[in-house]
């Protein structure tokens, strides 16, 4: 990660959004099985190795700091979190738990000159040539 809000994205980078861990009412908004949190954690850890990068496009978890600490302690990978509307943690708290918090968006230019902008909410309008990958819309 560099100071200009860039990150090297490769084919080994995992991208996910809107896990909403500890969101008690998420079932009202989108259909999830009863044990959805356990399934996400299991699938995450089955796929992601401890040294791989996970770029989370926001709304990682709700609730208190101990919930966040628990999740970062059991989920594999190096977490880069673009702050979503439900992510209310400070930069220093995230750093203390080995999570890189990205406040607004992440700009990435690939070797083939493709320009990507990762964000929680959709960015409209985009500058010419940029592709927006975002979460938020379920």
State the predicted function of each range.
Residues 1-68:
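N-terminal active-site segment of His-dependent metallophosphoesterases
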Residues 5-6, 46, 71-72, 106-108, ...:
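Short secondary-structure boundary/capping segments
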Residues 10, 50-51, 76-78, 128-129:
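A general structural motif
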Residues 16-17, 54-59, 79-85, 118-119, ...:
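Active-site neighborhood of phospho(di)ester-bond hydrolases with catalytic His/Asp-centered motifs
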Residues 27, 58-75, 83, 88-103, ...:
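Metal-dependent catalytic neighborhoods of phosphoester/phosphodiester hydrolases
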Residues 34-50, 77-95:
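A short, conserved beta-to-alpha structural element at the edge of catalytic cores
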Residues 40-43, 65-70, 103-105, 117-121:
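A generic local structural motif
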Residues 95-138:
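Conserved beta-sheet core of the metallophosphoesterase superfamily
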